[in-house]
Amino acid sequence: WIRLVLDRHKFPYTYIRDEDIRMGGLKDRFEVILFGHNYLDLQSQIHGIDKKFGPMPYTKTEKTPHLGVPDASDDITGGIGWTGMVELEKFLNAGGVLITLGNGSALALEGGLVRDVYRKSGAFFTPGSELKTKFLRTDHPLAYGLPEVTSVFRTWMPVYDIARSGRGGVIMQWGTKLRAEDREPEEPEATLTKEAREAKDKAKKEEVKMLVSGALKGEDELEGRPAIFDLPAGQGRVIAFNFNPVHRYLNRSDHRFLWNALLNWNALPPARGQAK
């Protein structure tokens, strides 16, 4: 789906294989690496198809003329492996930009390429929902041309949070309110004056609900959690989306986030917490 979007908009790119990442020298060849959404757990994102099934060629032959496109490999087992993870770390340390989409963000957020981010546990579920979001850094290039409060399409995938010291790296959050644990405790109803009760009722009616369309379970658990990260990694950075802006070429209104990331890769402000 990423290739379809880039091809249709005539956006130039180089398709790279697991072997290309393991080979190293990434910063000598690329400024930005885009890692797409997938439905794999972290182990499978790193190690790919089990090597016990290899070698497993993906090449064009007389018997398989339809294979080997857009690229070929003599063995597609093994994934990028730990060697590839080390090479991605070198790429970031040298100033490269890694952009991860949807569940593909687990590679960076859970794979150790950034710090202070952790998977959030809780009873939340977004099976395919349009949700309200809010930019916390409206001056960031990822927010160019967009209102402070907007909405994006989110399917089911992990939810992440970040240590308080790293929250400057959150560009956009889910919903428009503070996290539940950051809100002031409400006064007991019985202690409120009539005016205070009326003001509370009015505020509740005017409250912006997160769900725009679809289904949502555990809104309070998701409220205020990061939707887009911009995190330091060595001299480089990781732009991690907690949704997939190119979901099957259906959510075209979300392509804007990807374009902002790709077109402004060399105009990003210093990542919060990054050594100068």
Regions inferred by a protein language model and the residue ranges of each:
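Solvent-exposed loop/turn segments at secondary-structure junctions
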Residues: 20-22, 34-42, 98, 104-107, ...
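A generic structural motif
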Residues: 12-21, 119-124, 128-129, 273
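N-terminal beta1-alpha1 cap of cysteine-dependent amidohydrolase-like domains
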Residues: 1-36
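Short alpha-beta junction capping motif
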Residues: 30-107, 235, 241, 261
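Stable alpha-helical elements in mature extracytoplasmic
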Residues: 2, 84, 104, 138, ...
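An acidic, glycine-rich "communication" segment
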Residues: 104-210
